[in-house]
């Protein structure tokens, strides 16, 4: 399969491709022979370049080539108003000519032509008129037959570069393109017949008329007409599909040209192939021998020869594909990016085809924020770009070589029936070997990856029982089985009566069943004679090869983790819990860790977190909760203020059922524990000695609080009334 390929290198097979084209006799490289060779191109004929015909004219010069250009009528005489008129918006025939690019004769000019006396006495010309006449001499040329021809296209060169080019088209291309244009025009005339929603596709836009200019002055007819022309949308020109392909001296770029001509191009397409040459600077002065130089350092004859060689190569491919296309070849002196930008501005292509050497399975063909040619154009330019990976196209290149050789072998066999038997046998042997290669190798093959990782050696002496071979064999067997079962399902008469949904379900069952069988076969892959250790090593190396971690110089390993066989053995991993993070809040040394939130001081506006957490406990109506709500074994902290003695509450004390303070304006209401707090204390009896003793059991300052309450009963009553008005702050 792979040993047939020269040097066992599929990735670089594009370098050694050869087309067995019948040889041509040697000719001297002069201009006459090059012209004769251009005429002998067979079905291709020369055509005009882009700088002689506007690209939006639809190749009208080809259509009207027999009729010829009729010339532009220019008036022989000027009126007095035209000579001394300084207003740019005045209505005159010459002004109409410059605005519309056409000349409209007026009736009073005919009277001027008849009167010879007035024509002889021409008035004095101003400086502006002299400049106008000098410009007219640049734009018009009087031919030999007396016709006045314009030579001001392009009026100002948009693109200035040193380029040699060839434009040729197939002999049937013009005929087919005319038919295509007629078909398009017919469909545009009868839109309702060919389009479902013509109102949406060809919507007519209304142009707002211009009545006044920027200076609020009324606009003239010429200004209104200009505004209407500029605001009207013309749309895209009716041109064929244009494909631009870039090649250079590197062989991998020619794979893009092969793919463009052989796979991508269709009838009536315009293929533009460009290549660039570096600009050379010569310090020496020009001599008589340098007259034939096209650019500094390049002879025109050599460039013409190279253009013809490239065209010959494309011609061999077109003959095999048998398509009618137009081909443009350009050799530009300058930088690649600037040359491509110029070509895009000139030809306005629909597609751009480039080649790259990137071929890894886990590698992106396009990289953002890169300065390479294949990365800049797909990202920065609004043109659909095809990037052809040359090293992955070995199957395509081998098939192309086989078909081109078969085409010319069959031609030679028809012309020369009495050829040698040995030459025919050798050609047939080459054909068979190449067909064997192309039939076994697919685009999704991993043969090049195995070779790069060392699985396929140059001698190709690996055993047939290797894991890569078994995997590929299992995959091919499962695919054949699935396709065969689906074909049988479609041919079965009983299944024809089933609905589409049932047929789809049966197909899904076939795919699932065969995929499960293949997965089970992969699990039992090594067999009886292979040891488990060697099998594990082979599997691990194979997995590393698939994800690109086998070689030393591999890149793009951002999201891929290398595989090792030891990972399967240690499936259970122990997770060490880290120590709890230390609190960043520091308290005094006398503060205990069980004091809760009260250790932070007064917190009137803060919500009570403990009530929200222990809601289920407080919701239970267990009588034991009322008596023993506080742990008596843990003594409470004694707090004494420096100024006036006042009560400081903790979380444990505030949540107890026995603590019922009448002067608490910030405590919450708990209806489930049975004790009234806050506002509801007003409606209860003021004497509750048992509760007082239970709440102050462990406090040494209880007597002080009792004496304070007896002496200030009036103040207490006032505070109770305030709690009613402070209900919104609770």
Swiss-Prot record:
Biased composition (Basic residues): 713-723
Domain of life: Eukaryota
GO biological process, one term: autophagy of mitochondrion
UniProt keywords, alphabetically: Cell cycle
Record's compositionally biased regions (Basic and acidic residues): 615-625
Cysteines engaged in disulfide bonds, as pairs: none
Renumbered residue ranges of the record's region Disordered: 615-667, 684-730
KW Cell cycle (keyword) present: yes
Compositionally biased residues, Low complexity: 653-667, 684-701
SUPFAM superfamilies per the UniProt record, alphabetical: Adenine nucleotide alpha hydrolases-like
Keyword Cell cycle belongs to the record: yes
Protein name stated in the entry: Uncharacterized protein YOR019W
């Amino acid at each position: 399969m792979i040993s047939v390929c020269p040097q066992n290198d599929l990735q670089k097979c594009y370098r050694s491709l050869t087309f067995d084209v019948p040889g041509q006799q040697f000719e001297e490289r002069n201009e006459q022979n090059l012209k004769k060779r251009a005429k002998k191109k067979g079905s291709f004929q020369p055509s005009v370049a882009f700088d002689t015909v506007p690209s939006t004219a639809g190749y009208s010069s080809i259509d009207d080539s027999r009729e010829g250009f009729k010339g532009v009528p220019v008036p022989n005489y000027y009126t007095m108003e035209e000579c001394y008129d300084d207003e740019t918006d005045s209505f005159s025939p010459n002004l109409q000519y410059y605005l519309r690019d056409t000349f409209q004769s007026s009736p009073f000019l005919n009277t001027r032509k008849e009167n010879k006396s007035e024509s002889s006495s021409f008035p004095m010309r101003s400086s502006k008129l002299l400049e106008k006449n000098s410009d007219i001499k640049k734009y018009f040329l009087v031919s030999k037959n007396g016709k006045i021809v314009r030579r001001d296209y392009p009026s100002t060169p948009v693109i200035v570069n040193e380029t040699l080019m060839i434009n040729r088209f197939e002999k049937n291309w013009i005929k087919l393109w005319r038919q295509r244009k007629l078909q398009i025009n017919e469909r545009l005339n009868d839109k309702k017949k060919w389009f479902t929603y013509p109102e949406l596709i060809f919507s007519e836009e209304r142009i707002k008329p211009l009545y006044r200019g920027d200076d609020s002055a009324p606009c003239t007819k010429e200004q209104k007409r200009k505004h209407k022309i500029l605001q009207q949308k013309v749309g895209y020109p009716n041109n064929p599909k244009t494909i631009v392909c870039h090649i250079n001296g590197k062989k991998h770029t020619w794979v893009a040209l092969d793919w463009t001509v052989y796979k991508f191009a269709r009838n009536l397409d315009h293929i533009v192939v460009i290549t660039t040459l570096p600009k050379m600077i010569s310090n020496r002065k020009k001599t008589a021998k340098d007259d034939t130089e096209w650019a500094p350092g390049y002879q025109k004859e050599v460039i013409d020869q190279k253009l013809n060689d490239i065209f010959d190569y494309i011609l061999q491919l077109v003959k095999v594909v048998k398509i009618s296309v137009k081909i443009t070849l350009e050799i530009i002196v300058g930088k690649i990016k600037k040359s491509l930008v110029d070509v895009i501005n000139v030809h306005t292509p629909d597609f751009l085809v480039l080649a790259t050497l990137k071929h890894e399975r886990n590698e992106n063909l396009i990289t953002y924020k890169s300065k390479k040619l294949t990365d800049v154009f797909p990202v920065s330019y609004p043109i659909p770009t095809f990037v052809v990976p040359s090293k992955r196209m070995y199957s395509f290149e081998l098939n192309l070589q086989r078909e081109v050789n078969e085409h010319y072998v069959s031609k030679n066999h028809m012309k020369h029936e009495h050829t040698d038997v040995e030459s025919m046998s050798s050609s047939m042997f080459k054909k068979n070997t190449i067909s064997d290669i192309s039939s076994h190798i697919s685009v999704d093959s991993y043969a090049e990856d195995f070779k790069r990782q060392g699985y396929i050696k140059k001698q190709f002496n690996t055993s047939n029982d290797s894991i890569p071979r078994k995997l590929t064999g299992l995959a091919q067997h499962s695919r054949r089985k699935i396709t065969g079962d689906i074909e049988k399902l479609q041919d079965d008469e009983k299944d024809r009566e089933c609905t589409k949904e049932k047929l789809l379900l049966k197909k899904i069952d076939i795919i699932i069943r065969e995929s499960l069988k293949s997965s089970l076969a992969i699990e039992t892959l090594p067999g009886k004679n292979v040891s488990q250790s060697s099998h594990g090593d082979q599997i691990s190396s194979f997995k590393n090869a698939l994800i690109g971690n086998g070689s030393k110089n591999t890149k793009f390993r951002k999201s891929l983790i290398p595989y090792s066989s030891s990972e399967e053995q240690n499936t259970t991993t122990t997770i060490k819990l880290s120590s709890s993070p230390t609190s960043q809040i520091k308290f005094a040394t006398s503060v205990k860790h069980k004091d809760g939130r009260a250790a932070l001081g007064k917190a009137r506006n803060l919500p009570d977190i403990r009530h929200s957490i222990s809601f289920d406990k407080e919701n239970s109506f267990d009588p034991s909760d009322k008596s023993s709500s506080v742990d008596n074994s843990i003594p409470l902290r004694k707090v004494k203020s420096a100024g006036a003695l006042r009560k400081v509450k903790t979380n444990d004390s505030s949540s107890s059922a026995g603590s019922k303070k009448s002067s608490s304006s910030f405590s919450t209401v708990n209806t489930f524990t049975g004790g009234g707090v806050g506002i509801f204390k007003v409606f209860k009896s003021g004497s509750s000695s048992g509760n007082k003793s239970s709440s102050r059991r462990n406090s040494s300052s209880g007597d002080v609080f009792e004496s304070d309450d007896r002496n200030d009963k009036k103040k207490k009553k006032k505070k109770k009334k305030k709690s009613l008005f402070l209900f919104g702050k609770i």
